[in-house]
């Protein structure tokens, strides 16, 4: 494969969807062909020693598209014999691409394309980065579509969506669910609706709390528990909303990574009513959490925002809400699955099958490696 550098601000041990996406893909590439340039982080030394590939960390806490960074990338590329560079994301780091004197690719996620692509002051910068790149790596159809809104002068595009570790996230046998819930501090019986995300407005946790209140007072699901895992600036507001509505919701805070597979697998439904905000500037990039729920055999209810409808197939692996801000519609969708266990089971099994066949990181990394290999092939006239 083409020897290359990955240059990014977002790499483990930092926690987040993009960080996980990059690590899961790049750790599956031939280690002798990979060097990562990224930022410092607590416990980075321990993490870096466990990787099969080289990781270089800057002293600066944030990588910015400066001449200093461009020189650092050129020198490191020469040192390791890299033939190409992958820049993440397109803006701002993609701005150094044209000056590297090497073929370069840029990664396209969600808001990292949408926001600069729709603001007059940055649209032309993004268009230039995209047009001058040798390859675009899009994390799904949504960021590719956003790139095509910016300019028609695009290089080849390959879609490499987020994946999931289907060996780590697996279904639980029914006999294990009660004991697993008890171990995690959750009610052993009764319907369990799970959501995992940063607690920020566009994730729609307020809508989920209001939907939970409607479901519990309807008389159909009196033992319902809505478990919300994650941290974020919306925590205090959500606490107040739970108290106001009397919703059977619990804010679990940050869940240790080793406990996540079991938490998904002991739920009945996964729900994330993500929504678009600010005229479409804020949207869901893809939603790795939907894939983790799918691998655990759990159907999802998703808000139709950005790439979420790619992660959940409406009516097959879960339900997609056209109006994610409507708590009545969300309550109805969740209620459909809770009231029809056979349907929920079918959709959960279909979700698991799709996770194994379409979102295996081994398969996705193979496609990524083939795309990067083409970066090192000189263009023919």
Q: Each PLM stretch: what is its role?
A:
Residues 170-186:
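A short helix/loop element that forms part of the nucleotide-sugar donor recognition site in Leloir-type
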Residues 187-203, 209-213:
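Conserved donor-binding/catalytic core segment of Leloir-type glycosyltransferases
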Residues 40, 142, 163:
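Carbohydrate-associated surface elements
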Residues 219, 236-261, 269:
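Nucleotide-activated donor-binding/catalytic signature segment of Leloir-type glycosyltransferases, i.e.
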Residues 254, 265-283, 298:
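Acidic donor-binding loop of glycosyltransferase active sites
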Residues 179-182, 336, 343-358, 364:
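A short, well-ordered alpha-helix in the C-terminal region of glycosyltransferases
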Residues 87-93:
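Short His-centered aromatic/hydrophobic patch
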């Amino acid at each position: 494969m083409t020897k290359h550098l990955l240059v990014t601000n977002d790499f483990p041990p930092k926690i987040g969807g993009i960080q996980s996406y990059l690590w899961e893909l790049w750790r599956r590439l031939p280690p002798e062909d990979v060097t990562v340039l990224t930022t410092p982080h607590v416990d980075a030394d321990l993490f870096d020693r466990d990787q099969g590939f080289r990781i270089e960390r800057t002293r600066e806490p944030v990588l910015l598209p400066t001449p200093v960074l461009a020189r650092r990338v050129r020198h490191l590329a020469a040192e390791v014999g890299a033939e190409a560079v992958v820049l993440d994301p397109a803006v701002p780091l993609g701005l150094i691409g044209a000056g590297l004197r090497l073929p370069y690719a840029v990664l396209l996620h969600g808001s990292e394309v949408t926001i600069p692509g729709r603001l007059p002051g940055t649209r032309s910068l993004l268009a230039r980065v995209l047009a001058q790149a040798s390859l675009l790596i899009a994390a799904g159809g949504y960021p590719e579509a956003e790139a095509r809104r910016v300019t028609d002068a695009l290089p080849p595009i390959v879609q490499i969506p987020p994946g999931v570790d289907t060996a780590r996230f697996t279904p639980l046998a029914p006999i294990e669910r009660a004991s697993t819930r008890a171990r995690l501090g959750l009610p052993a019986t009764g319907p369990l609706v799970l959501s995992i995300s940063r607690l920020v407005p566009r994730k729609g946790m307020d809508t989920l709390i209001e939907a939970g209140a409607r479901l519990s007072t309807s008389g159909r699901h009196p033992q319902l528990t809505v478990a919300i895992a994650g941290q974020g600036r919306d925590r205090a507001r959500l606490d107040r909303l739970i108290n106001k509505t009397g919703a059977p919701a619990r804010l679990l805070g940050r869940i240790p990574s080793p406990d996540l597979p079991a938490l998904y697998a002991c739920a009945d439904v996964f729900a994330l009513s993500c929504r678009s905000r600010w005229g479409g500037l804020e949207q869901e990039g893809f939603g790795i959490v939907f894939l983790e729920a799918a691998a655990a055999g759990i159907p999802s209810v998703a808000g139709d925002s950005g790439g979420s409808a790619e992660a959940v197939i409406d009516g097959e692996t879960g339900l997609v809400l056209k109006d994610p801000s409507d708590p009545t519609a969300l309550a109805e969708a969740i209620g459909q699955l809770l009231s029809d266990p056979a349907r929920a089971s079918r959709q959960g099994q279909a979700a698991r099958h799709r996770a194994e066949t379409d979102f295996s990181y081994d398969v996705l990394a193979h496609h990524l490696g083939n795309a990067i290999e083409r970066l090192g092939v000189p263009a023919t006239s």
